[in-house]
Amino acid sequence: MRISIVGITGYSGMELLRILLQHPQAEVVSLHASQDMEAPASELYPHLKGICDLKIEAFDSQEIMRRADLVFFATSSGVAKDLSKDFVEAGFPVIDLSGDHRLPGNIYKKWYQKEPAEDYVQKAFIYGLSEFTDVRGERFIANPGCYATATELALIPLLKARAIELDFIIVDAKSGLTGAGKNPAASSHFVHVHDNYVTYKLNQHQHIPEIVQQLQRFDKRLQQIQFSTSLIPLNRGIVATVYSKLKEPLTREELAAIYQDCYQDKPFVRIQAALPNLHQVVGTNYTDIGFDYNPVTNILTVVAVLDNLIKGAAGQAVQNMNLMLGFPETDGLLSQPSYV
């Protein structure tokens, strides 16, 4: 499978390249930046010397379709919605890691403050939460966001089991700094984030409508969630702590069964006996989930952790590619956590 990557200079693009270079059925044939830039990848990123010496090329949709079989967009929001149009019209497979094709146009415009993709382009894409979306044979996949992936994987089993009250769902999500992207900003300067804890976009994060939209697939009565996001001074990782009230008390064994039944055939979701931590998943495509129930308050706390650049971005994109094309789901994705 010949692959082109657009958006190679960002964190997710570089992680995507790293994974695909080790994929047994993928050949990366071209690298592109969303802005004009022509230089060997190993010149910009010396860690690639002797590993990948492909030249970063200007974007040309026709040239990509001539040389590749599938294109990944690992671009900032607002880019892929325009650049993907030629591929959609040609029926050429696209996996978009940005938020450009996850939401209906009017909702995208409200939350991203950008003009949306043309309606026929947006409607061509299917939302690719790998564990709950059948993408076999699809051509256009909108890869989920990092916060959204962690939150949805934590909550969907409970919604499927009709186990929780829908008017009390609180998500406190924290991300490492790569989640803020590569473009420099005062909010991600070292002196601002080092030895600090910064809450941002309270009630305004663009993943909120994405999460609600997907949770409604499993219970249409759900209307809203309370969602907060914070930056923590780490390179990688998402920790989503999710609070909900049970409709009726459940034992730990009953709660574990809800999650085990949902994920028993899902290789990248692990249900842990203890509350998980980031060292268990950083550098991998795993999401680890743990929980604890307080019978005094009737509040269930679920903790989901993942690597925002892998399961929250590039890894899930490759997982979707595998499922789309009928490859083994785990191809290229069985790296182990470094742990320390």
Curated annotation (Swiss-Prot):
Instruction: Report the locations given in the UniProt record.
Output: Cytoplasm
A Pfam family that this protein carries is Semialdhyde_dh
Q: Could you name the active-site residues?
A: C146
**Reaction catalysis annotation:** N-acetyl-L-glutamate 5-semialdehyde + phosphate + NADP(+) = N-acetyl-L-glutamyl 5-phosphate + NADPH + H(+)
This entry carries the following GO cellular component terms, namely: cytoplasm
Superkingdom to which the source organism belongs: Bacteria
Answer yes or no on keyword Oxidoreductase. yes
Q: Name one GO molecular function term.
A: N-acetyl-gamma-glutamyl-phosphate reductase activity
> Chief subcellular site?
cytoplasm
Keyword Coiled coil belongs to the record:
no
One record GO biological process:
L-arginine biosynthetic process
Q: In which pathway is this protein known to take part?
A: Amino-acid biosynthesis; L-arginine biosynthesis; N(2)-acetyl-L-ornithine from L-glutamate: step 3/4
Q: Which UniProt keywords apply?
A: Amino-acid biosynthesis, Arginine biosynthesis, Cytoplasm, NADP, Oxidoreductase
Catalytic class of the enzyme: oxidoreductase
**For this protein, what is the EC number?**
1.2.1.38
Q: What does the function comment of this entry state?
A: Catalyzes the NADPH-dependent reduction of N-acetyl-5-glutamyl phosphate to yield N-acetyl-L-glutamate 5-semialdehyde.
| Listed HAMAP family | ArgC_type1
**Family per UniProt?**
Belongs to the NAGSA dehydrogenase family. Type 1 subfamily.
Can you say what this protein is called? N-acetyl-gamma-glutamyl-phosphate reductase
